Protein backbone atom coordinates (compact mmCIF):
# COMPACT_ATOMS: atom_id res chain seq x y z
CA UNK A 1 0.00 0.00 0.00
CA UNK A 2 2.81 2.41 0.83
CA UNK A 3 4.42 1.77 -2.56
CA UNK A 4 1.11 2.39 -4.31
CA UNK A 5 0.58 5.63 -2.41
CA UNK A 6 4.10 6.75 -3.30
CA UNK A 7 3.32 6.25 -7.00
CA UNK A 8 -0.26 7.45 -6.93
CA UNK A 9 -0.97 10.00 -4.23
CA UNK A 10 -4.32 9.72 -2.45
CA UNK A 11 -5.95 11.47 0.47
CA UNK A 12 -6.09 9.02 3.39
CA UNK A 13 -6.75 11.61 6.09
CA UNK A 14 -10.23 10.11 6.56
CA UNK A 15 -8.79 6.71 7.49
CA UNK A 16 -9.03 5.51 11.10
CA UNK A 17 -6.74 2.72 12.29
CA UNK A 18 -8.43 0.72 15.05
CA UNK A 19 -5.78 -1.27 16.89
CA UNK A 20 -6.86 -4.59 18.31
CA UNK A 21 -4.59 -4.91 21.31
CA UNK A 22 -1.65 -3.60 23.28
CA UNK A 23 0.65 -4.86 26.00
CA UNK A 24 0.11 -3.41 29.46
CA UNK A 25 2.43 -2.92 32.41
CA UNK A 26 1.44 -2.46 36.04
CA UNK A 27 2.02 0.87 37.78
CA UNK A 28 0.88 2.61 40.94
CA UNK A 29 -2.05 3.96 38.92
CA UNK A 30 -3.08 0.55 37.62
CA UNK A 31 -2.37 -0.90 34.20
CA UNK A 32 -0.82 1.39 31.60
CA UNK A 33 0.39 1.01 28.02
CA UNK A 34 3.87 -0.34 27.57
CA UNK A 35 6.07 2.51 26.35
CA UNK A 36 5.99 3.10 22.60
CA UNK A 37 9.80 3.07 22.61
CA UNK A 38 9.54 -0.72 22.95
CA UNK A 39 9.76 -2.29 19.50
CA UNK A 40 7.25 -4.94 20.56
CA UNK A 41 4.57 -2.43 21.54
CA UNK A 42 1.63 -1.97 19.19
CA UNK A 43 1.99 1.81 19.49
CA UNK A 44 5.50 1.48 18.07
CA UNK A 45 4.36 -0.97 15.39
CA UNK A 46 1.50 1.11 14.04
CA UNK A 47 3.59 4.26 13.82
CA UNK A 48 6.71 2.64 12.36
CA UNK A 49 5.21 -0.10 10.18
CA UNK A 50 1.77 1.16 9.17
CA UNK A 51 1.06 4.88 9.51
CA UNK A 52 4.67 5.93 8.95
CA UNK A 53 5.15 4.19 5.58
CA UNK A 54 1.64 5.11 4.38
CA UNK A 55 2.11 8.77 5.25
CA UNK A 56 5.70 9.15 4.14
CA UNK A 57 5.21 10.45 0.60
CA UNK A 58 1.91 12.24 1.13
CA UNK A 59 1.29 15.93 1.76
CA UNK A 60 0.66 16.60 5.43
CA UNK A 61 -3.02 17.38 4.87
CA UNK A 62 -3.57 13.99 3.21
CA UNK A 63 -1.98 11.85 5.92
CA UNK A 64 -3.51 9.63 8.59
CA UNK A 65 -3.83 11.80 11.67
CA UNK A 66 -2.37 10.82 15.04
CA UNK A 67 -5.81 11.15 16.62
CA UNK A 68 -7.15 8.67 14.06
CA UNK A 69 -5.03 5.84 15.50
CA UNK A 70 -7.25 4.31 18.16
CA UNK A 71 -6.27 2.15 21.10
CA UNK A 72 -8.55 0.95 23.88
CA UNK A 73 -7.90 2.81 27.15
CA UNK A 74 -7.03 0.46 30.04
CA UNK A 75 -8.72 2.93 32.40
CA UNK A 76 -12.05 2.41 30.62
CA UNK A 77 -11.81 -0.66 28.40
CA UNK A 78 -15.55 -0.97 27.99
CA UNK A 79 -15.83 2.43 26.31
CA UNK A 80 -13.90 1.25 23.26
CA UNK A 81 -16.68 -0.84 21.73
CA UNK A 82 -19.10 2.06 22.08
CA UNK A 83 -16.60 4.44 20.48
CA UNK A 84 -16.19 2.05 17.54
CA UNK A 85 -19.95 1.52 17.20
CA UNK A 86 -20.64 5.26 17.34
CA UNK A 87 -18.17 5.72 14.47
CA UNK A 88 -20.07 3.22 12.32
CA UNK A 89 -18.28 0.00 13.25
CA UNK A 90 -15.22 -1.71 11.83
CA UNK A 91 -15.15 -1.72 8.03
CA UNK A 92 -12.20 -4.08 7.71
CA UNK A 93 -10.17 -6.05 10.24
CA UNK A 94 -6.81 -7.66 9.44
CA UNK A 95 -6.39 -10.69 11.70
CA UNK A 96 -3.60 -13.05 12.65
CA UNK A 97 -3.60 -16.19 14.78
CA UNK A 98 -1.29 -17.47 17.47
CA UNK A 99 0.60 -20.53 16.28
CA UNK A 100 0.24 -22.75 19.32
CA UNK A 101 -3.13 -21.86 20.84
CA UNK A 102 -5.08 -20.01 18.14
CA UNK A 103 -5.32 -16.76 20.09
CA UNK A 104 -6.55 -13.81 18.07
CA UNK A 105 -5.63 -10.34 19.30
CA UNK A 106 -5.04 -11.30 22.96
CA UNK A 107 -8.17 -13.48 23.26
CA UNK A 108 -7.05 -16.79 24.79
CA UNK A 109 -8.67 -20.20 24.38
CA UNK A 110 -11.98 -20.22 26.23
CA UNK A 111 -12.92 -16.66 25.27
CA UNK A 112 -16.69 -16.25 25.12
CA UNK A 113 -18.37 -15.51 21.82
CA UNK A 114 -19.92 -12.37 23.30
CA UNK A 115 -16.69 -11.07 24.85
CA UNK A 116 -15.81 -7.45 24.26
CA UNK A 117 -12.83 -5.19 24.84
CA UNK A 118 -11.18 -5.91 28.17
CA UNK A 119 -7.93 -6.33 30.08
CA UNK A 120 -6.64 -9.88 29.74
CA UNK A 121 -4.03 -11.88 31.60
CA UNK A 122 -2.03 -13.38 28.75
CA UNK A 123 -1.79 -17.15 28.60
CA UNK A 124 1.64 -18.74 28.75
CA UNK A 125 1.12 -20.05 25.21
CA UNK A 126 0.41 -16.54 23.92
CA UNK A 127 3.47 -15.18 25.69
CA UNK A 128 5.64 -17.98 24.29
CA UNK A 129 4.36 -17.24 20.78
CA UNK A 130 5.33 -13.59 21.27
CA UNK A 131 8.70 -14.61 22.67
CA UNK A 132 9.39 -16.18 19.28
CA UNK A 133 7.91 -13.25 17.35
CA UNK A 134 10.08 -10.60 18.99
CA UNK A 135 13.75 -11.45 19.26
CA UNK A 136 14.30 -8.61 21.73
CA UNK A 137 12.58 -10.73 24.36
CA UNK A 138 15.35 -12.83 25.82
CA UNK A 139 13.29 -14.94 28.22
CA UNK A 140 9.60 -15.50 28.93
CA UNK A 141 9.74 -13.31 32.03
CA UNK A 142 10.41 -10.29 29.80
CA UNK A 143 7.12 -10.72 27.91
CA UNK A 144 4.36 -8.65 29.59
CA UNK A 145 1.79 -10.71 31.45
CA UNK A 146 -1.23 -8.53 30.62
CA UNK A 147 -2.73 -6.79 27.65
CA UNK A 148 -5.84 -4.95 26.56
CA UNK A 149 -7.71 -6.50 23.65
CA UNK A 150 -10.85 -6.25 21.60
CA UNK A 151 -13.13 -9.19 22.23
CA UNK A 152 -14.49 -11.95 20.05
CA UNK A 153 -17.77 -10.08 19.57
CA UNK A 154 -15.84 -6.95 18.61
CA UNK A 155 -14.07 -8.91 15.87
CA UNK A 156 -17.16 -10.78 14.70
CA UNK A 157 -19.05 -7.51 14.26
CA UNK A 158 -16.58 -6.29 11.61
CA UNK A 159 -18.16 -5.78 8.20
CA UNK A 160 -15.27 -7.60 6.56
CA UNK A 161 -12.16 -9.44 7.80
CA UNK A 162 -9.18 -11.27 6.42
CA UNK A 163 -7.08 -13.75 8.39
CA UNK A 164 -3.44 -13.85 7.28
CA UNK A 165 -1.55 -17.08 7.98
CA UNK A 166 2.14 -17.24 7.13
CA UNK A 167 4.93 -19.72 7.74
CA UNK A 168 5.25 -23.37 8.61
CA UNK A 169 4.65 -22.62 12.27
CA UNK A 170 1.05 -21.67 11.45
CA UNK A 171 0.06 -24.99 9.88
CA UNK A 172 -1.84 -26.13 12.95
CA UNK A 173 -3.92 -22.99 13.24
CA UNK A 174 -4.69 -22.98 9.51
CA UNK A 175 -5.90 -26.57 9.77
CA UNK A 176 -8.06 -25.77 12.80
CA UNK A 177 -9.64 -22.80 11.04
CA UNK A 178 -10.32 -24.70 7.81
CA UNK A 179 -11.89 -27.58 9.71
CA UNK A 180 -14.21 -25.29 11.68
CA UNK A 181 -17.58 -24.03 10.52
CA UNK A 182 -18.28 -21.56 13.31
CA UNK A 183 -16.59 -20.04 16.32
CA UNK A 184 -14.95 -22.61 18.58
CA UNK A 185 -13.97 -21.11 21.96
CA UNK A 186 -10.97 -23.40 22.35
CA UNK A 187 -9.46 -21.99 19.15
CA UNK A 188 -10.29 -18.25 19.08
CA UNK A 189 -9.01 -17.71 15.52
CA UNK A 190 -12.11 -19.55 14.31
CA UNK A 191 -13.93 -16.25 14.89
CA UNK A 192 -13.15 -15.61 11.22
CA UNK A 193 -16.21 -17.76 10.43
CA UNK A 194 -18.43 -15.32 12.33
CA UNK A 195 -17.48 -12.30 10.22
CA UNK A 196 -20.02 -11.31 7.55
CA UNK A 197 -17.47 -11.15 4.71
CA UNK A 198 -14.33 -13.17 5.36
CA UNK A 199 -11.27 -14.68 3.73
CA UNK A 200 -8.28 -16.67 4.93
CA UNK A 201 -5.01 -15.88 3.16
CA UNK A 202 -2.18 -18.37 3.47
CA UNK A 203 1.31 -18.74 2.08
CA UNK A 204 2.62 -22.06 0.73
CA UNK A 205 4.44 -23.00 3.93
CA UNK A 206 1.39 -22.67 6.14
CA UNK A 207 -0.80 -24.43 3.55
CA UNK A 208 1.51 -27.39 2.99
CA UNK A 209 -0.48 -29.90 5.10
CA UNK A 210 -3.76 -29.05 3.39
CA UNK A 211 -3.33 -32.05 1.07
CA UNK A 212 -3.94 -34.26 4.08
CA UNK A 213 -7.20 -32.60 5.09
Regions found by a protein language model. Name each.
Residues 1-34, 89-92, 103-124, 164:
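Active-site histidine-anchored catalytic micro-motif
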Residues 1-7, 46-52, 175-178:
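Short, well-ordered amphipathic alpha-helices
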Residues 6-15, 63, 155-158, 192-196:
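Short, conserved loop/helix-junction motifs that constitute active-site signature segments
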Residues 10-96:
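Ligand-binding beta-strand-loop-alpha-helix segment within the catalytic cores
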Residues 69-73, 138-144, 178-180:
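Short, flexible loop segments at the rims of nucleotide/cofactor-binding pockets, characterized by
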Residues 81-82, 103-110, 115-117, 173-177, ...:
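A short secondary-structure junction signal
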Residues 102-150:
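Class I SAM-dependent methyltransferase SAM-binding "motif I" and its flanking Rossmann-like core
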Residues 150-153, 157-213:
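ATP/nucleoside-binding phosphotransfer catalytic cores, i.e., glycine-rich phosphate-binding loops
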Amino acid sequence: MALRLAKRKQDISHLTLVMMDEYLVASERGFEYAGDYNVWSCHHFVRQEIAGPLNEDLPHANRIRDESIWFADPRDAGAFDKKVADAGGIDFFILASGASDGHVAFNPPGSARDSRTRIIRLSEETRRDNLQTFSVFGVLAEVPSHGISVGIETIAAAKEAVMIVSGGGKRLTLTRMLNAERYEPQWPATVIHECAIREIWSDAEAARPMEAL
